[in-house]
């Protein structure tokens, strides 16, 4: 590159011409060749600044050829370059000159690193829209053809992503050539190329004329769906969604459904997984009639698949499948053709399958209505609530509101609540712990009145559990409940019960009072803390057990910042000073620490 700011010039070259404005640009251009990768990367990221300074003509004639010739760099630098060039049209003189950006991007689309190629293709797709139809045929289509017939598989995979953007604006003769190139890539010897073609088959189908979809795309789909590589076959399933949307019911039944049915029974679980994963989209694409006759049987076999991953993917789609069924006859189809399979999955041996089902099964209550929910779904919910897998239980509890809307709180409390209470009092402390963690969620769904009536006593009972982890979790639970239900509720319902525990004969329970005060003080605010909690804490400073006394010091340190100066100086300070002289070393230490932290010395 010639001139003051040429890449070969040092920074001094620009300065020597007396043009100081180009000095930093010369530095940036020099850095494009620097041995330090980070400097090259920084310079590439400022490429638009360099281009602006050079002007459109020099960018076209000097910068772009330089970049094209030097594309032998670290992947990170090439990735940044591919991204920058996608937004460069304005810097080379606008759409009339967009074709100047094609050579460097063509080189980038052939490199070994996938992320660089993908970014180059993304930028090429962007730039294709800025070409006029004439320029597209003169410059862009030849580039696509070169990539499509390149010796290296890398260029051929990149070509697959470019057919759909140039096809709609091409002339009929060129369209035929583009289709021919795409066909040959679909039967390429290299699996990576066939994969790339299969992944773009649906996108390409959308821009083709209907006749071409039927005569060319469908045969390609059929071949790719029976490819020897399962990674190609599963991408063909994805393409099926787009293809199905384009065809009439008659053509679908004759041309596509046999292949799709075959995919649902493919010998590779990955292909069957893809059918399950795309099931809702396929159901919408083929329409209600074919869905009932062809897809429901396929779905049943996926729900009973020998691979857990496939069953889990199908289970995830149960709710959507049921919601997408035509309203007329929906209930009968679900009750006779889906529910028996769901019942089996509730006791599946794999926890991922059960968890997937639990995340959607509650939603069926809105589809099936009150009576069916009570008779058929509630027993399943109960079974899942008692499942040994915590995730299954959580997914049921998290979605209780769906059922609440359909059957009402009273019915819910009569059926599911006893199970929740049973778990809350389970002999295994880890089960109790799991229920505590769900409690704020449950409380939010059931509302304050219901909570006070049915669950409040449980929450208080956990505070005196014989396992410390339960007492600790119960304390945090109270704080979350106060955040949900507000300070007035705390003042009337929770705080009095917590403070009564300060007189408990068991010192562990007395300490729990302090832990609760630590957790609740912030949520309850200054007034409740000062008037109701502080007097109890101060009184406990005279406890006979040293562990209680040093926790008093820790509590005063915790709630101190919430209190006003009068309370701190008049009430807290004397008590901490007294504890600071305690005969127990730990009490003395924590009292002195509190005095220091609260600046009461």
Swiss-Prot record:
Which stretch is the leader sequence? none
Instruction: Decide whether keyword Repeat is in the record.
Output: yes
Protein keywords: Acetylation, Repeat
Q: Where is the PTM N-acetylalanine found along the chain?
A: 2
Query: Where are its TM segments located?
Result: none
Gene Ontology cellular-component terms listed: glutamatergic synapse; synapse
InterPro entries given in the database record: ARM-like, ARM-type_fold, HEAT, HEAT_type_2, PP2A/SF3B1-like_HEAT, PP2A_Regulatory_Subunit_A
| Gene3D superfamilies (alphabetical) | Leucine-rich Repeat Variant (1.25.10.10)
Which stretches are HEAT repeats?
Answer: 20-58, 59-96, 97-135, 136-173, 174-212, 213-251, 252-290, 291-333, 334-372, 373-411, 412-450, 451-489, 490-528, 529-567, 568-601
Spell out the coiled coil positions from the record: none
A Pfam family this chain is assigned to: HEAT
The protein's assembly and partners:
PP2A consists of a common heterodimeric core enzyme, composed of a 36 kDa catalytic subunit (subunit C) and a 65 kDa constant regulatory subunit (PR65 or subunit A), that associates with a variety of regulatory subunits. Proteins that associate with the core dimer include three families of regulatory subunits B (the R2/B/PR55/B55, R3/B''/PR72/PR130/PR59 and R5/B'/B56 families), the 48 kDa variable regulatory subunit, viral proteins, and cell signaling molecules. Interacts with IPO9. Interacts with SGO1. Interacts with RAF1.
Domain commentary: Each HEAT repeat appears to consist of two alpha helices joined by a hydrophilic region, the intrarepeat loop. The repeat units may be arranged laterally to form a rod-like structure.
- Family per record: Belongs to the phosphatase 2A regulatory subunit A family.
The free-text function statement in the UniProt record for this protein reads: The PR65 subunit of protein phosphatase 2A serves as a scaffolding molecule to coordinate the assembly of the catalytic subunit and a variable regulatory B subunit.
Name of the molecule in the record: Serine/threonine-protein phosphatase 2A 65 kDa regulatory subunit A beta isoform
**Organism expressing this protein natively:** Mus musculus (Mouse)
């Amino acid at each position: 590159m010639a001139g003051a700011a040429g890449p070969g010039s040092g920074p001094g070259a620009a300065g020597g011409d007396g043009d100081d404005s180009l000095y930093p640009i010369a530095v940036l251009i020099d850095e494009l060749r620097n041995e330090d990768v980070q400097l090259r990367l920084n310079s590439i990221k400022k490429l638009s600044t360099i281009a602006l300074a050079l002007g459109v003509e020099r960018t076209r004639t000097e910068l772009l050829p330089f970049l094209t010739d030097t594309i032998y760099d670290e992947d990170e630098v090439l990735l940044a370059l591919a991204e920058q060039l996608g937004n460069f049209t304005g810097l080379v003189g606008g759409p009339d000159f967009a074709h100047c950006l094609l050579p460097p991007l063509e080189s980038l689309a052939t490199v070994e690193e996938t992320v660089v190629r993908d970014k180059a293709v993304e930028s090429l797709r962007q730039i294709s829209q800025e070409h006029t139809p004439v320029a597209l045929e003169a410059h862009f289509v030849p580039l696509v053809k070169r990539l499509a017939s390149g010796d290296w598989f890398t260029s051929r995979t990149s070509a697959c992503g470019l057919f759909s953007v140039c096809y709609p604006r091409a002339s009929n003769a060129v369209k035929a050539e583009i289709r021919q190139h795409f066909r040959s890539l679909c039967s390429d010897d290299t699996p990576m190329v066939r994969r790339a073609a299969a992944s773009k088959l649906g996108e390409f189908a959308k821009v083709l004329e209907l006749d071409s979809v039927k005569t060319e795309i469908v045969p390609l789909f059929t071949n790719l769906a029976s490819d020897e590589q399962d990674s190609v076959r599963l991408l063909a399933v994805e393409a099926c969604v787009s293809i199905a949307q384009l065809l009439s019911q008659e053509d679908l039944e004759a041309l596509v459904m046999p292949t799709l049915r075959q995919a649902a029974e493919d010998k590779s679980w990955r292909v069957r997984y893809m059918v399950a994963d795309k099931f809702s989209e396929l159901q919408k694409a083929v329409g209600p009639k074919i869905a009932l006759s062809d897809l429901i049987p396929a779905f049943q076999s996926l729900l009973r698949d020998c691979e857990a991953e496939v069953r889990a993917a199908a289970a995830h789609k149960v709710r959507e499948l049921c919601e997408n069924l035509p309203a007329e006859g929906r209930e009968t189809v679900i009750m006779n053709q889906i529910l028996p399979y769901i019942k089996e999955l509730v006791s599946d041996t794999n926890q991922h399958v059960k968890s997937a089902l639990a995340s959607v099964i509650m939603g069926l209550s809105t589809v099936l209505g009150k009576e069916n929910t009570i008779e058929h779904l509630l027993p399943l919910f109960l079974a899942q609530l008692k499942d040994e897998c915590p995730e299954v239980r959580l997914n049921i509890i998290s979605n209780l509101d769906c059922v609440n809307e359909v059957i009402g709180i009273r019915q819910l409390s009569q059926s599911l609540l006893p199970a929740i209470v049973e778990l809350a009092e389970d002999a295994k402390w880890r089960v109790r712990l799991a229920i505590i963690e769900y409690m704020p969620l449950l409380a939010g769904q059931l509302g304050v009145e219901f909570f006070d009536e049915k669950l409040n006593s449980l929450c208080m009972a956990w505070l005196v559990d014989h396992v410390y982890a339960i007492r600790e979790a119960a304390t945090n639970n109270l704080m979350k409940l106060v955040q949900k239900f507000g300070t007035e509720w705390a003042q009337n319902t929770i705080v009095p019960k917590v403070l009564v525990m300060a007189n408990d004969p068991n010192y562990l329970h007395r300490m729990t009072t302090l832990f609760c005060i630590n957790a609740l003080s912030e949520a309850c605010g200054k007034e409740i803390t000062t008037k109701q909690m502080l007097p109890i804490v101060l009184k406990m400073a005279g406890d006979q057990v040293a562990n209680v006394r040093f926790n008093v010091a820790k509590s005063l340190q915790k709630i101190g910042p919430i209190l006003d100066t009068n309370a701190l100086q008049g009430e807290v300070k004397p008590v901490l000073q007294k504890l600071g002289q305690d005969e127990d070393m730990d009490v003395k230490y924590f009292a002195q620490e509190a005095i220091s932290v609260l600046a009461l010395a």
